[in-house]
Structures are given as C-alpha cells and as structure tokens.
Amino acid sequence: IDSLYKENNDMIKSLSICVNKFIGSYAFGIINELETDVLYALRKDSPLIIGVGENENFIASDVPSILKYTNKYIDIENDEIVKITKDEVTVYDKNCNIINKEISVFEGDANLVEKNGYETYMLKEIHEEAEVIKKTSEASIDFDITKYDEIDIVACGSAYHAGLVGKYMIEKLCNIKVNVCIASEYQYDKHFYRGKTLVIAISQSGETADTKKCVNIANDMGVDTLGIVNVKGSSIARICKHVIYTLAGPEIAVATTKAYLAQITTLILLAVKNSKEKINTEDLQKLPYYIETLINKDYTSLANMLYTKDDIYFIG
C-alpha cells in the first residue's frame, strides 16, 4: 500500500489496486500518516462494519462492539473500499466508483452487551439461557424441510455439535437423511447432491469463514441453503436463500452458552414442526423452568472442592 501510494499519491486508487491483487481473507483498517484525520478500510471474507455516529464514525468486526456509541451501521461487502472521517463515510467499489450504501439500525436492546452487574459476560449469558429458550421456543418456525430428500448440516465448533442433535431429531421425526459435516472439511469434498438437497449452515456470528464458503459452494451448485444464525444482517444470513434467526441476543463470551442452546432448540423445533406425526411439546415448554432451576442452585461447595485441584479428568 505504501509503495503504491508513493507512486500515485491517491489512497483510493492504491487500495483499489491492492483489492484486485490481494489473495486470502482479510479486514484492514488503514491510516495514512499524511492524513491522520482519515481512516480507510477494506475487506474480503472477514467481517467488517462501519458504525455511523454523531461527529464520529467507527470500523469494527461486528455491531455489538459499537453499541456503546451508536446503533447505526453500514454493512461492507467483499472488495469494497471505505474512506471515513468523523463527519462522512464514503464507500467505493474495487474500480473506485462511489457506491450508495444503506444505513441499518440495530433494533435490539443495547444493554444486552453490558455485564449488568455480573462479574463476567459468561456468567451473565448463562443466566440468560432460560429466557432465550423461552423466546426461541415461542418463535414461529414454518420452514418446510419435508420437500427435501437429504439435508447436509455444515458448521464449526459448538455449532457442529448442535447439528448432531439436529440430525438425530430430524431423522427420527421427519424420516429425512441428514449428514452433519465440519465446514472446514465439507468445502473440499466432492458433492453429488442427488435428489432434492438442503444445506443448513449453523453459525452464531453468521461470519464463520469456513461455513460461509460451504454456503457459496451450495449456492453455486443451485442447492437450497438455510442459515441458522444469531446475528441479523450477517454474511451467512445475507448469502443463504433462507434464514432462521436464533433469538439469543449478543453473545460476548468466547465460550458459547445461550447461543448453543438456542441453536439446539431451533433445530428441535424445526424437526417437530415438520414431523409426520403429532408431537407433544409440553416438555419443551418446561425447559426454561428446568434450566432456571439448575442455574439458581448454589454450587459454592462444589467450586471450593474443585478450584484447588491441579487436574480434572472428564470420563464419558
């Protein structure tokens, strides 16, 4: 970038050349020492949004990180170049043409990204699980999966394990063959897609790079795609032909808690709603109560016993 700028003295032109040459995934924030009141940004396959404030603008990877300052944001797509001052945001395509971008507004509760008296985000999010399951189980899920002969679930990490639960429930209740695949491996497999196939992509953030690549492969092959994601307007939500949002709210802690349970609940509901037999959902409605009962137990004595130990073996 520095070398190109010295040649043409034009940051947008220099970044345009870079965008057309760069290989791989990236999201860059760039400052030119000759114009320190301007911030430049560009991305490919890594998340990037622009927060739009009053006399201030921001670059960030996701919306929750800017909610302390503003609830307005702009989604940036692959190969777009952004020039930001405190008063203005200008977006260009890779050929230096200005693009008109829509400003979105986060409609959720900004307090959801605060600790609200809890010592850690993880503890707070554990205590939100019962309400999340209640909201998710009350949501209307009317996507028809019975028209498909086979379903591929692609995901990474905890979302993959949620997919394993989904496989069991869908096969048992809907009599549809389900394959659960780790996204980083699925993208390199040969796909035959015999019959009518649905690819379900599960991701809390909606930005998981490997999962996103799987969706693009399925889309390119003309296969239906369904995203089960937690973040509205995320990349996977935008590229999937269909989307179901889990209602977990922002999850800040690295270790997933409420989002994982919301994914499992969504998959169970998807199976129940498409079941060929009538399913009694009374037990599902009781889940929030059971979760809250478990969470509110006093685990102090157990913690006191464990925290002095050097090693713990989990056998199962």
Outline where the language-model segments fall.
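Conserved beta-strand termini and adjacent loop/short-helix elements that scaffold enzyme active sites
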Residues: I31, K94, C181-A183, I315
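Generic beta-sheet signal
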Residues: Y26-F28, L39, I151, T197-V199, ...
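Cofactor-pocket helix-loop regions in the catalytic cores of large enzyme subunits
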Residues: V19, S137-A155, K278, D283-G316
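Short beta-strand segments
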Residues: G29-I31, A41-R43, A60, A201-S203, ...
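Short acidic (Asp/Glu) and glycine-rich catalytic loops that position anionic groups and cofactors
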Residues: R43, E114-K115, I244-E251, I268, ...
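Glycine-rich phosphate-binding loops that contact phosphosugars or nucleotide phosphates
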Residues: T146-Y289
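Conserved short alpha-helical segments that host acidic/polar catalytic motifs at enzyme active sites
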Residues: I1-K115, E119-T120, K124, E131-K135, ...
